[in-house]
Amino acid sequence: MMDNINFEFSNASQGSRLQLQQQPPQPFNLQDLNMIQYNQPSSPWTTETFSGLTPYDCTANQSFPVQCSSSKPYPSSFHPYHHQSSDSPSLDQSVSMIPMQPLPDQYMKPLYQRSCSNDFAATNASSASYSLSFEASHDPQELCRRTYSNSNVTHLNFTSSQHQPKQSHPRFSSPPSFSIHGGSMAPNCVNKTRIRWTQDLHEKFVECVNRLGGADKATPKAILKRMDSDGLTIFHVKSHLQKYRIAKYMPESQEGKFEKRACAKELSQLDTRTGVQIKEALQLQLDVQRHLHEQLEIQRNLQLRIEEQGKQLKMMMEQQQKNKESLLKKLPDAEASLSLLDPHIHSPPSPFLVHDAEALMLTSYEDTQLQSTKS
């Protein structure tokens, strides 16, 4: 790494020498920097330039934006490096006499490594193409590589010095391929390898899915952990799980739809028949309940009549008992009257009197029974 740049190019055949001399620091506005135009003879690297290779690279560690323009010449007062070949007499003498001066250290710290063994000004051609790339060490987004060709088309390529190794020679180096988005380097896509889902592997997958609660609850990460197969990644499991869900919840075929419709018709007819039968059974049940209610009413009336008859029988028995007691009371009185009439006759009580009393009681009972039936 060098703080000051001294470009020295020697040509033994023509004896011309071009040397960069360091000048005192001058104010330099890099934002107004335009395209540096070189009108030099062709170099040995012209073929390489047209082939897509850069003849040499110059790098400068500075964090500043560079504005490039291919239509306006670079003013001589702001040339960081300006030189004129001795073989080109068409340029202005005042411009050609201005020596090439490098930028001060505080503005630019160029990194340049080149093994210079060829002459820079010894070749004869009408145009030359050079490549100049500035690399920002502090801000990786402000790196610009500019390539100048005969068509004066400017090509910009933004690179980051933090991720690029230093190149010793541009001829054996390739242009940077990093692209910066928001200060970070975009990672390369991982190549996905395809695998063949065999029957055993699929059965193992289905078993893991069922253990995890079905296709809806299973996750690719859990399935991959349970399967534990070599060469199987989460991308394979995720894709296969999606296909498995689609196949599981695929709509039924037309055959299945027709069968389903036929079953639905049969079920509707069966439901109609069953409804009619249930209705008839309910009607019969209502009729039976009505008959039972009528029978219960009849039994209730009979029970009431039986209770009334029992009360009447009880009253009749009580009346008969009273009549019997009254007759028994009358018998001693009759015997006493007979003894008063004939005291010498002591005859036992006649058994016919008791029989007569019973017959009397029966007749009285029959009379009361007839009266109750009539009423």
Swiss-Prot record:
Question: Main site of residence?
Answer: nucleus
Q: Kindly list the GO molecular function terms attached to this UniProt entry.
A: DNA binding; DNA-binding transcription factor activity
Under the heading Pfam families, the entry gives: Myb_CC_LHEQLE, Myb_DNA-binding
Q: Where is the composition biased (Polar residues)?
A: 159-171
Keywords from UniProt, A to Z, are: Coiled coil, DNA-binding, Nucleus, Transcription, Transcription regulation
Q: Residue numbers of motif LHEQLE?
A: 292-297
Note whether Oxidoreductase occurs among the keywords. Answer: no
Query: One cellular component GO annotation, for this chain's record?
Result: nucleus
Quick one: a GO biological-process term for this protein? regulation of DNA-templated transcription
**InterPro entries this protein is in?**
Homeodomain-like_sf, Myb_CC_LHEQLE, Myb_dom, Myb_dom_plants, PHR1-like, SANT/Myb
- Residues in HTH myb-type domain copies: 189-249
Residue spans making up a coiled coil are 279-299
Cite the Gene3D superfamilies for this sequence.
Answer: Homeodomain-like
The region called Disordered is annotated at 159-178
DNA-binding stretch(es), residue numbering of this chain: 220-245
* Compartment list: Nucleus
Which family does the record assign?
Answer: Belongs to the MYB-CC family.
Q: Which NCBIfam families match?
A: myb_SHAQKYF
Q: Which PANTHER family match?
A: MYB FAMILY TRANSCRIPTION FACTOR PHL11, TRANSCRIPTION FACTOR MYB-RELATED FAMILY
Designated name of the protein: Myb family transcription factor PHL5
Species the sequence originates in: Arabidopsis thaliana (Mouse-ear cress)
Give me the gene this protein comes from. PHL5
